[in-house]
């Protein structure tokens, strides 16, 4: 069985900046996904490179500048993640997700499948809870992650062409 690592990125003391952590917790609380590890990645650290290297599949939730309305959710998969990270619009953290992916790539331990689920923030600043707009996005963000996990785990012969 493949193992999936779900990272929630962000600072929960800065309102919507903690959206990734809140989305990860929502997924863990509302979905039964065996062989899935949930990790509050905070504002990221190079120490997470080992966790990423040991994952077959990786999903990262984060507040991201996706040029959309507050609370909108966008899913980037595999090469789309790489393109988005190269755009420089995404991370407000000291160590970026792009840095961690580069480490995994250089060491030859890039997960087989990976996705970034970005949530457009509304309020960045002090606050121990996300804005109402971003809070309402949690079910949609978690549902997207659960769907990806199920899709990635299906045997190849069960996946219809074009999915």
Predicted regions and their residues:
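N-terminal catalytic or cofactor-binding beta/alpha core of small enzyme domains
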Residues: 1-112, 116-119, 128-139, 144-163
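Short "lid" loop at the C-terminus of a central beta-strand within the Rossmann-like core
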Residues: 122
